[in-house]
Amino acid sequence: MSIKIRLQRKGRKKKAFYTIVVSNSRSPRNGKFLEKIGFYNPNTNPYTISINVDKAVNWLIKGAQPTCTVKSFFLKEGIYYKKYLLSGVKISKSEIEQKLKAWKEKKIILHK
């Protein structure tokens, strides 16, 4: 059973928003899912992304494969960086949070 992290379409015609879900790769796009880990709303300006980082990292460590769109969200939010810090050398959770916060601040400065 292959597990995917993907978008599930919600909303009405031309006003779609998406929930980020973990599901079996064989289930339909809007069908049964294992867990909801966030949402994406492209209708707001700027768009809104909310992801439960701990759940996302947990599923990535278990081997779930994100789709291309979800992977780009994870890269923007620093989820892959947190997974890298957790799987590497043993460091405390406070140090992980400090490094993640510094990474996000550096990213904000670069994009201004």
Swiss-Prot record:
Sorted alphabetically, the keyword list is: Ribonucleoprotein, Ribosomal protein
In alphabetical order, the GO MF annotations are: structural constituent of ribosome
Q: Which Pfam families match?
A: Ribosomal_S16 (PF00886)
Q: List cellular component terms (GO).
A: cytoplasm; small ribosomal subunit
Question: Could you tell me the superkingdom of the organism this chain comes from?
Answer: Bacteria
Statement: the UniProt record of this protein carries the keyword ATP-binding: no
Q: Which residues are connected by disulfide bridges in this protein?
A: none
A single GO BP: translation
Where would you find the membrane-spanning parts of this chain? none
Q: Which InterPro entries match?
A: Ribosomal_bS16, Ribosomal_bS16_dom_sf
Q: Which family does it belong to?
A: Belongs to the bacterial ribosomal protein bS16 family.
Protein name, per record: Small ribosomal subunit protein bS16
Q: Which organism is it from?
A: Karelsulcia muelleri (strain GWSS) (Sulcia muelleri)
Q: Which gene encodes it?
A: rpsP
